[in-house]
Amino acid sequence: MALLELERISAQYPGAETPVLADINLSLGPRQLLVALGPSGSGKTSLLNLIAGFVAPSGGRITLDGVPVQGPGAERGVVFQDDALLPWQNVLGNVAFGLELAGVPRAEREAKAREMLALVDLDGFGERRIWQLSGGQKQRVGLARALAADPRVLLMDEPFGALDAFTREQMQELLLQVWQRTAKPVFLITHDIEEAVFLASELVLLAPNPGRVVERLQLDFGQRYAAGESARAIKSDPAFIETREHVLARVFSQRQSLQERA
């Protein structure tokens, strides 16, 4: 049964000649890691913003647990590419910030924040200042903060896009570990093909102008990692390589088609 449903979603910005998104139908179910991948102009970030409730769709309906999404809410935790942390707060204060706004007592919110920091392998980092953290550590704090409110679904907007290649791989593996431990449904957008293939239980390919779904792939590489298989073994598997090359060819063909129309 789907927790999150998008039915015939379209989006068009004021003054734009063409829609950003057209006729998008998606569902996110329990324990699913849904990844949206597409070239620039395919509406990935716009799609996430609609689900988060930051903007309203021009047409269609978005529901969470059968209730229409009509604005931001704590039941949808968001992790951004820019860590968006509060520099005047320490790590613990950042993770507990949403709980503080919700009126959770201090002892309870700090205990929850420490639990989430342990989940993302930052046990003992609570008193550190944000400027003392590496890029990967900041993203771990952002993930812990999003999880602290116990959201129904986790939304991730190219969360590893600004990280170096080594740290990016570490964060991909951490996300799969957290996904397995928490059983939280995740909707993630990325422009990185290998990342998308590795993480997704379902991969949705978007084409641009307007953004629309052109292919859906059911994948198990992330589940294999969560079950204990090494990332190196998975990424050298001929099945992984074949899938990656198939997705790469689809994305390149979309870009070429876009250039020919320009």
From Swiss-Prot:
One matching Pfam family: ABC_tran
Signal peptide annotation: none
EC nos: 7.6.2.7
Record carries keyword Membrane: yes
Topology of the protein relative to the lipid bilayer: Peripheral membrane protein
Key word Cell inner membrane present: yes
Chief location of this protein within or outside the cell: membrane
Localisation: Cell inner membrane
Domain ABC transporter per the UniProt entry, residue ranges: 4-233
Entries under InterPro entries matching the protein: AAA+_ATPase, ABC_transporter-like_ATP-bd, ABC_transporter-like_CS, ABC_transporter_ATP-bind, P-loop_NTPase
Protein name as catalogued: Taurine import ATP-binding protein TauB
Organism, scientific name: Pseudomonas putida (Arthrobacter siderocapsulatus)
Gene from which the chain derives: tauB
